[in-house]
């Protein structure tokens, strides 16, 4: 199965519309072909993933248990920190940017 990361949110005034864009995209992806990895970027620029990201009713304050994740340059793997150590979360095969505005659709 292909791991598909969908990035949404962001550090700008279009943060909320980007969440809607990301969730709309996710709702149309064939889950039999792709393992969807939602990656939410909060207004501080921190990245998170977790199942609670798939429900719009959880935004912005009810995101439950999320993993704070990040990428390493020239690597297609999301990592998280546990007990002060970097741990592998998942390899990303394809990434889709559903970001709007500065630090998003500007590249």
Where are the regions that the model predicts?
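ATP-binding N-terminal substructure of ATP-dependent carboxylate-amine bond-forming enzymes
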Residues: 1-107
